Amino acid sequence: MHQSDVADRSLFSLSWPIFIDIFLHLATLLINTYMISHVSTAYLAAMGVGNQVFDLFITIFNFISVGCSVVIAQYLGAGKRDKASQAIHISIAFNFLLGFSSAIIILFFGYNILNVMNTPEHLVQDGYNYLHILGICLIPEAISIILAACLRVYGKSKAAMYVTLIANIVTVIGNMIVLYGFFGLPQYGLVGVAWSTVVGRIIAVVLLCGLLFYGLRIKFDIRLLVIWSKNMLAKILHIGLPAAGENLVWILHYMTASAFIGLMGEVPLAAQTLYFQLSLFLMLFGIAISIGNEILVGHLVGAKRFDDAFTRGFKSLKAGVLFTIGVVIIYWFMRDPILYSITEDQRIIDQLLPLFILSVFLEPGRTF
């Protein structure tokens, strides 16, 4: 596809593969949560803290991908493919450093993080075993977020979606083996689930690299990974940092809430874990539409079509709010079958049911 065609594509044609991709991406942790919930409530509570720490770092990685997407889209819209390639390399290198630094923080301060979040004492060791292995996953995760964002900007949303699907299949198969002892292997519990996630993410990075550098014939230049243009990085950060601020505050809010809930015991913490994952899915429509909008508006601005970019932005906002309202209403009416499908613990279900009414008012406002 010629890059100028991207600006003239419909929002739906770009957003639905992005929706499926992010859905599958979030489904990795939800699959872990679902499978663990049928094994042990204690494991579920211990995993919840680790998942929230993981999501916090993912939010940090995403601010680079947002800035990267907009900058690349503008360069492609203006026909400056060399500049777009430079932005890709800088973003990959910067996110790799963020991922590596995050993994080091979890490795050395994992116990401190769990204690700050008031994790019940009998869950701390299981939580750390899960968290420190999941920390290794942050390195390929940081890289894959950038690679997938670059593919979307080039109009290859479906390719990123298929890669995430493959990674999820690998994770599910791995979970089945380590949790249920298939093929005569021992049951590894949370540690096995974490390693399954790591393997799935590494496979995703390999596939995404192949699609970006070989499929799109973008020349891989190692010099661009180590020699950065300060102006280019500043432009990416200038766009990405404000975009990440709201999501970062939202994740920190949940982590703070979890710290208080941790004082209440194992069952409330397990309930918070499930509600946190369900909340992420409620946001999916708005997230997918916003990313599709970023790509379209970036191409339009790069092509100097400012009026079209302005109109496109408000149409996307309207679509995002309407879709979110529709999804929240469906969630409300389906709350009982949803909860009974993901846990059999009646104590957790009783605590979760009243929270669904909050989502009816909270999620449409968050779409803005």
Where are these regions (language model features)?
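Helix-terminus/linker motif at the lipid-water interface of multi-pass membrane proteins
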Residues: A27-A45, L114-E121, L179-Y188, L248-F281, ...
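Signature of the first transmembrane helix
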Residues: R9-S69, A73, L241-L263
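Membrane-interface helix-loop junctions in multi-pass transport and translocation proteins
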Residues: N168-V206, R335, D350
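Small-residue hotspots at the loop-to-helix junctions and early N-terminal turns
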Residues: T41-Q52, G127, L131, A194, ...
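Small-residue-rich hydrophobic transmembrane alpha-helices
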Residues: L44-I104, E141-A160, A271-R335, R366-F368
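Short membrane-interface helical motifs at transmembrane helix boundaries
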Residues: S101-H132, G326-L353
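Alpha-helical transmembrane segments of multi-pass membrane proteins
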Residues: E121-L147, Q346-F368
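Interhelical loop/hinge segments that connect adjacent transmembrane helices in multipass membrane
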Residues: M1-S13, A194, C209-W250
